[in-house]
UniProtKB/Swiss-Prot annotation:
Domain PH, residue spans: 82-175
Disordered: annotated segments: 620-641, 783-805, 847-872, 1013-1065, 1113-1141, 1167-1234, 1256-1276, 1385-1405
Enzyme Commission number, as recorded: 2.7.1.107
Keywords associated with the record: ATP-binding, Cytoplasm, Kinase, Metal-binding, Nucleotide-binding, Phosphoprotein, Repeat, Transferase, Zinc, Zinc-finger
Protein name as it appears in the record: Diacylglycerol kinase eta
Bias type Low complexity, positions: 1167-1187
UniProt lineage: Eukaryota, Metazoa, Ecdysozoa, Arthropoda, Hexapoda
ZnF Phorbol-ester/DAG-type: positions: 195-245, 268-319
All residue ranges annotated as the DAGKc domain in the record: 350-486
Reactions catalysed, as given in the entry: a 1,2-diacyl-sn-glycerol + ATP = a 1,2-diacyl-sn-glycero-3-phosphate + ADP + H(+)
Gene Ontology CC, one term: plasma membrane
Root EC class: transferase
CDD domains: C1_DGK_typeII_rpt1 (cd20800), C1_DGK_typeII_rpt2 (cd20852), PH_DGK_type2 (cd13274), SAM_DGK-delta-eta (cd09507)
Localisation: Cytoplasm
Amino acid sequence: MANLKPNTLHVDNLSPRQRSLSSGLSSACSSGSVSPVPIIPIISISRDGEESETESEIEPEPARIFHRRMSTHSKRNNNLSAIIREGYLMKHTWSFQRWRRRYFRLKRSYLYYAKDAKCDVFDEIDLSELCYFECSIKNVNHSFQIITPTRSLVLCADSRREMEDWLGSLKTATAPQRPRGDSFLIDQHDILSNHHHWYATSHARPTYCNVCRDALSGVTSHGLSCEVCKCKVHKRCAAKAIANCKWTTLATVGKDIIEQPDGSLIMPHQWMEGNLPVSAVCAVCKKTCGSVLRLQDWRCLWCRDTVHVACRPQMPIVCPIGPAKLSVVPPTSVHSISTDDAWDVVSPKGNFSPLLVFVNSKSGDNQGVKFLRRFKQLLNPAQVFDLISTGPSLGLRLFRHFEMFRILVCSGDGSVGWVLSEIDRFNMHKQCQVAVMPLGTGNDLARVLGWGSSCDDDTHLPQILERYESASTKMLDRWSIMVFEKAITVPKMPKMSITTEQEALLTGMVTSANHHLRFIVETNDTQTLISSTRSLCDTVDELVSRICEHHKDDEQLAMKCDILRQKLTMLLDALQEEELGTHSGDDLVATIRSLISRSGPLTTARPSFLNPNISIEKTEKDNINSKERRNSRSLRSSEKEALQCRANSVKRAIYNVVEHSEPGRPKRYQRKLSITPFEALKIPITNSGDSTPCGSPLPIIPPINIISPTMETSRLTCISPLPDTRRDSVDENFFNSINLPAPRQFADSRRSSGVPEVIQEMEEGASGETVYRVGRLSLSGGANIDDAGNRLSPSSEAGENTPTERKVDFLRVPIMTSEPIVDPLSNYRPIEVFERTYYMAREMDKDKERTASGQVESEKEEADVNEKSEPQEPHRALVHTCNLQVPGIVVTPQSQNVYTSENFTIIDTDAQTNTEQSSSEDLGGEASDVLSAISNEECSVASEIFDKPESGHSLGDIIQNLDANNFTHIDSPETSDETEPMPGESLMDDISSVLGHDITNALQDNTITDDTTTLCSEHAGPTKPPRKKSLSALVQSKTHPRRRNSSPPRKAGLARMDSDDNPQQFGFENIVFEIDNRCDDQKIREPPRYCSLAQFVEGNDIARQSFKQLMLDRNSGDNHNDNGKNEEADTPTNSAPTRTYRNLTTTTTSDELETAIKIEINNATTNTTTSTSSSISTTTTTSTTSTVKPLESAMASSTSPTKKSGHGQEISVVVRPPTPLRGDSVKPTASSASSASLLATSSSLLGVRTLNSSEIRRHSSHAPSLAVRDYDKDKDRRHSGFNPNFLTLDPEHARFLSSSPAASRRISCGSLFKKRNQKLNVKRTYGLFSVRFFVVAEPDIRLATLALIRPLIPLPNEALPNLQTLKGSKSSLFMGSTLFGFEHFSAGDKDEKPGKDKERTPTEETNRKLPIINPIVRLPNWPNLANGTGFISKCLMANADTLCAAVSPLMDPDETLLAGYHEKCVMNNYFGIGIDAKISLDFHNKREEHPEKCRSRARNYMWYGVLGSKQLLQKTCKNLEQRVQLECDGQRIPLPELQGIVILNIPSFMGGTNFWGNSSKKEDIFLPPSFDDRVLEVVAVFGSVQMAASRLINLQHHRIAQCQSVQINILGDEEIPIQVDGEAWLQPPGMIRILHKNRVQMLCRNRSLEVSLKTWQEKQRQHSISIQRDTSSTASEHAVSTDEVISERECYVLLNFIEAVSSLVKWVKFLIISHPALQHDLYEVACRASEALESIHPQGKLLEGPSLRTKLVEVIDSSRQLYDDACTLLRDRGHSLILREDLETKLSAALANMEMELKKCSVQKCIDGKLRAYFNVLAPNEEPDGRRKSRPFWVRLRSGSTAGQQQFKPPITNTREAANNWSVNEVVTWLETMQLSEYVDSFLKNDIRGKELLTLGRRDLKDLGVVKVGHVKRILQAIKDLSEN
C-alpha cells in the first residue's frame, strides 16, 4: 500500500462513478505515477486534488488508501534518531472550517501526525513530490499548506519564526542528502538555489499557470504565486515548476551568460512568460501586449519591460536593470562567496551604489511581509533579508567586500538599533550609510531624518527608492549606556518566586543545559559525553521539577514540561541507538539505559557547606567510572545530523519552558537572565588528523566539560576585573572553549565569581615537547580541598598524589538551587561570605584542639619555609573543601618553584628564589614574559593557584589565607583574631553611598594607605610586624612573617590609633572607624580593625598591588647602595623579582597637566629634599621626628629595595598618578626624552636604577601607540607564543576588562588637576619604584573634603592649595559657593578634557561652554540635595552646595569606561528613566501577552494613552528624585519633585513629540538641538499630563541641561524602569553613565535635491522627445534614422522657421534704411542671416540628407544673433526712436514669431563630432525661456508714440486662441507630449483640431476610444489648462 499515486490507478473494474472520479483525479493531479493496485474505492475528491476532509478519524472508510497509518511503537527506539523535527501544530479541518491541535513528526521524505506524541499509530504522508507554501498573506495567523499527490494539509504555527522553521525543515526533509558542510553555506542555500517561494493568493483578472498553461481555477483565480518572480501555478503544479526564479549570483544565470570580447560580462534579460499587467506596452512596437485569453508575451524580471513574442528578437540583449539600477546588485557582479563568508564582487560599470535591505516582517501593521516581497521583486533577492529570520549579521557579512554601500532598515527604532549594533560588531562604519523606512510604531529616528512617520503603501516603492538614492548624509551620534549594578536587598519571601530572586538559578540551569547539549553534539570524548549526558538529565529534571512546583495550576506549562521530558528521552534514545553495535558493552550505553529507565527523575538535594540555604550536589556523577575509551566516535553524516536535530529540539523546549514561566516579563529574561534568542547547534567540522592517540591520558584538545558550567547571577553584585566571559589564550587551541572565571585573588570582595572551572595550560619544555598543565580554581580562593573537607597544600598533595591513592573526579560540583531562603540577602550575597562563614564554623571546632605551642611551631616552620624557599610538609589537619582539587602534583627538590607530575607541570612564577629564572630571562634587560603578565592585562594563573600555602593556626589565619600564596584581596576589612568580622559589604560602600563615589575616591586616593607597599616598590621591607615583635627588631631581622596582617601591632610603632597618632596608613575607611571608635568606650578598649583599598593601574582593573605577597629581604643593611651604579651592580641577584612588579613608564604631552603629591622624609634630618620639574618646586617639611617614625612604618612601601635603616632613609609617598590616556590620544612626543631624563633624575634621588627601554615595553593593550622598539615587539611576539601565563583577551571585551566598583576610586587624569595654563609644563612619570611626582598645580575639591573630615592630613603646608588664589569664590571653605573655581564646567575651556580627540563643534564656535544648565535649576524651589542622616552627611551639610552642585567629576568621560562599568546597550534616540519607561514596559508586556491586540499602529497609540492615563492615577514613579541622582558633565543637578528624566539625542520622543521644545527666542541660552553635535538634552518629566501636553504645546520649563555626558545614580534597593529607544527593562540600583560611543552615517531626505532632479529629468525627457523623429504606427518607419531625413512634421516647422527668418531680415533691413542714424552692424548681421538662409535652399530647392541639418546650424546661429541684436538696439534706443506705426507693428510681429520659432530649434553635437540642427515638433514651451526674464521688447518701446502704445496688442502665444488655431498635427503632438500616443490614430481619423479639442468632453473621449479612467482625467485636465492659459 506504500507510495500510492493516483494517475496510474487501474480503473478497469471500477463503476462509472468511480471511473469518472479517478479520471478526474488523474487529470487534476498529473504529477507522478502510482504502482498498480487492484480495485480501489476512492472517495470524492475536489477538482484541484485537495481532500475535502483531511481528518482520518472522521473520513469514510475507503479513504484509508490515502492515509496510510503506521505503528511507531515498535520502531520508536530505532527510528527516532532520524527525526528532523517534531512538535505541535494546528491542523485545518475542511468540513467544519475548524482547527485542531495535532502532534507532527517529520522524517526524511515522510511526515507523521497524531493527536499527541504518546500515540502508537500515526498517519503517514509521503513527501516525495511535495509542494509547500505560505497561506497567510498579511502575516496574520502563520499558516502554511503542504500538498502532495495524495494529500493537502493546511497547518498553522504559533509564530512566524516557527512557521519558517517548519518550512525549512520540510525543505531539508525533501532535499537530496548532501555531505555536511559549513553552516553558513547551508544558510545561504536559499539565496543561491533559485527556488521559488510560493504563497497562496487570489487574482482580480484571469491568470494562467506557468507550468500547465491552464487558467487558475475559481472566479478569483486562486492559486500560488512566487513572491519574487510572480510566477503563477496551480497548487498541484507547484512541485513540477522548474527552479528558474530571479537570479541572485553569476552561478544562477547559467547558460544565459553573455561575455563581451574584452572579457566583461553583460547583464541579459530574464524573461517570464504571460500574466502581464493591464497597461503593458511592447518596448519595441509600443503597442499593447499581453492577453487575458491565454499565456502569451514576455516580461523581464529586472527592467520590467514587456515585449511581444514576435518583437522579442528585436530587443537589445543588454538589460538596463530598470529604474532602480543604481541600487541593484547585478547577479553578473556577484561571482561567489569567499572564504570569509562575503561575496566576491566585481563592480559593474557606471554609477553603482548597492542597497542592502533589512525588513522586519512583523513591523508596519503586519505589512512587513508585503514590503519584503516587493523589495525582492525590485532588487536582487540576495540583497533583501528578513530580520526575524536571519538577523542583520548575514547580510552584513555578504556585503563586507563592497567599498561603499547603503543600508535600508524597514522597521521601527528597535530594529534600527539592532542593525547599528551589528555594524559596530563588524566595524563597518566607514563602509555603509544607513537609511530608515518607517514601518514601526514610533519611528522617531525616521521622523528626524525626514522619512516621515509611517510608510504603509508598497505600490510607490520604486519612487521611494529614488528618494533614498538622492538622500544626503548626516552623522548620528551614538551613546553607550554604561551600567554598574550593585547588589540589592531582596525581601524574604515564603516561597520561591521565579520572577524575583531565582532568576539566577534559572539562568544557570539554562546555561548549564545549553553547555551540555553542545558538548553532546560536538565532543568526541566518551568521558565527556557520559558526564554531559548525566549532567543534562539532572539539570533538566531539576529545572522541570522546580518550575512545576511553583506553577502547579498552569496546564500549558505542564504540557511544555512534558514535551521537554519527551524530547530529552528521544535524545537519549538517539544516543543509545548511535552507540549500539559499536560500543554495546561499554559504560556509555549502560549509563544511557539507566537514565532512560528512570521514570521520575529526582535529584537528591542536601544542604551545602558553603551556603546552607541554597545548594544541592549531584551524587549520580560519583557513580560514573572515568575510564579511558575511544577518543572519537565515528558517526555517519545522517546520524550526526539527527543527533544535532535532537539536541536543538531539547534546547528549544527548554527555552519554551523558561519563557512561559514568566510571560509578563520576557525582556527581563533576555536582558537580565541572559537568555538570548534561540541559536541552533551546529555540527562541528572535524578532521581525522585532529584526533588524539588513544594512549594519551589527556587529549590534545582538552575536554570541554570537565567541570559543569558555573551558575550565572541575574545581576552582578559587583563587576569582576575578569568577567565570566570567554578568554582566549595565546595558543588558540586551549582556551577557546573554556570559560575562565576571575581568580578569587583578583575578584572584588563583594563579587560572586561563581564556581571556577578547570584551567589547562600548555608550556613548551626544554626538549621541545608540549606539557599540559591542569589547574583548578577552588571555591576557597585557590586552596585545594579533599572530599573530607580538609585543606591540601601543594606539598601535601605532592606527597599523596598517585593515581592509585587518589582518583580525580571532576564531576562533583556544587550547584546552586533554591531551597527556601532563610536570609533575604543570601541570594545576592557573595560566595566569599558563605565561604568565610563556613570556614569560620569549621575552624572554631578545630581551634579548640590546637595548642598554643603547636601554633608557634607551625608559624616558625612557615617562616623557615619562606626564608629558604623550600616546600615543606604542613603539620596540621586538612581543611574540608568542595572536591575541586588539582590532581597529580609532584614537587621536585631541584626547583623550588616547579611542581611536576606525570600529566602536567606547574611553574610558580612568583616563588621567592634567586637562582631560578623564567624562560625569557636569557634576553638581557628584558622583563620576564611570565612575570610581566602581572603588570599587563594578563595574570599568572598557575602561580596564583598553586603557590605553597602555610598552615593556619587560628580562625583569622584560615580566613585570611584561603589562597595558596598569601594573595588576599584587600578591598574588604581584614579579619583576624584581633578584628571583629564586618557584617555585610565593605565599609567603603556605606561611605560611598552617603558621600557618593566621587567624594569617596577623593578621600581614599589622597590618603596614605598601606597599599603603598606594593605601589612604590616590590620589596617593601617589613610589611607589618608580627605580633609580639617590635618594629626595630623587625627591621633588623631577615625573617619575614608569612602572615599578612594589616592591623596595627599591639606594642610597637603604632600602638594605638587616635587623633595624636598617624592612622592614615590604613586608609580613609579606618579614619571613619577611628572616629566611630572614639564615640564608643567599649570600642576604645577593643583593638581597632582596619580595611584597605585596592589599587588600580591603567589597563588593569585591580593592580597587583592589591594582593599582598611576602617579599624576602635579600639586601641587608651593610650591602646597601647609595647611588645608581651600586644599584646596577646589585641588580643580577634581584633581576627576576625586580621585574615582577615593574610598571610601564610613560610620558604625556605638555597640554596634559597631571600631577601628584610627593612627600619626602629624611630619617637623618627633619629637612626634606627638594625635587623640581619645570617651574614647579615643592618642599615638604615635617615638624618632629616623632611624626616620621609612624610614617616610616606605615609608608615602608616607598623605601627603595636597597635602602634600609641607618643611612638616612628617604621615603617618597606617592598618591596615585593620573591614569594614562587610551587609544590614539597616547602619542609619543618630543617630551619623551625629557620625561625619561626626569625619570632618571627621580630614580637616582631614590636610589633606584633607571628603567631601560626594554622594560617599558609592556603596559596595556589599550595604548598601542607608545614608543616601543621593534626589537622589543618581536620579543613580545616570540615569547608570547609559548608563555603559559599569558591569557590574552577577547578584543571585544578588552576595553571593559578593568571592571570593578573600586576602580572608580582612582584619581582621574582630568579631574584632580585640571589644566589651567598650558605654559605650566609638568611631566609625569609613574611606576612602582618611587618615581617622583610633583605637587598639585590646581586646587582640588578632594583636598578640601579631606580637611573637612580629618584634620590630620599628612600633607605639608606648602602642598595645600592657596584658597585666595582660586578663580572661583573667595569665600570660606565651609560656605556654599563654586569652590576652587570649577566654573570650567560651565564657562571654562571645553577642550580641557584629555583623551577627547574631538572635532570643532558649533558649541565651541559660538563660545557656549557645556554643560549649559537651565537657570531655574538654581532657583530656591528646587530642593537641596543633602538629605542623608549619617554623620558624614552632617559633616558636609554646611558645604552641600559646594560639594554637590559644582563638583568636578572624579572620572573623565573617556576613562569611565575603565571604572567597572559594562555596556548595557547603545542609545540612538533617547533614554528615559521613570514614568515614560514604565509606560513603555507596560506596553511591551501587554504586547507580549496579547500580540493580536497590538498589530495596528493606531491601536498601539491607543494603548499608550491608556497606560499613560493609568500612570496618572497610580503614580508608580512618584518621588523619583529621592531614588535617583543626576549629574551632567560632573555637575550634580538638584531635582524637583518629578516622575521621570528623559535624555534626548534626537528632537523626537515616543512617537514624534518634540519634548525639548522649539527654541524660537534669540536670547535662548541653549544650543539648537541636533543629533550630530555630540550634545545631549536632559529634560524632566513631571507626569503623564505633561507628556500628553507636550504634543500640543511648546513646553520649555522642564528643560534641565545640555551636556556631553550624563551620570544617573540609582539609590535604594528597588529596581527602576528604564527605556532606551523604546525598549524598556527594570534596572537594579547602581550607576548609569551615558557616554559618546561613535558616529554613524545616516541618510536624510533631501527635498531640494529631489526637486532639482525632477526638474532636470523633465527637461531631459523633453529634450529626448525633441530629437526624435516623427514616429509612425509601423515598425519600419521607426527604423529610419532621424539624422538622414527631415520628417514631414519637421519640414513643416522648417518652413515656418524660414518664413520667420526672412520676415525678420526684411524688416530689420528696412528699419536700418529708414533710420540712418542707427548703427550699421545690425545690417551686416541681417545680411549674414540672409546669406545663410539662401544656402539651405539654393535655386529655390531645399537641401536633402544630413547636409541640411548641418547648414541649418548656421542659419539658427545667425538668426538668433539677429534677434538678440535687434532687441538690444530697440531697448537702448527705444526712448528716442520714433517709428512709423506700420513698421512698429510689423517689426513686433516679426520678432515675436522669431522668438517662437527659435524655441523649436535645438543644436546637438552628434557622435561624429558634427553639429546638427533639430526641430521640436511640439508646441512652444509654456514656461518662458531664460531670455524672457526681462521685459518684452514691445514693452520697452513705451517711450514711443502714444498711438502705437494704444493700438499695441501682445502676440498670441500659449492662449486659448492659439490652441483654437491648432491643426491636427499640432493636436497629435500635444497628445504625444502627454505620452498618450496610442490615441493618435483615433484623433487623426476623426480630424480633431484645436477648436474641437477645446470642446471635448468625457463622452466624446469615450467615443474616441479613450476608455481608461486615468487617461480620460489626464486629457480633460490638460484641456482645462489650455483653456485657462
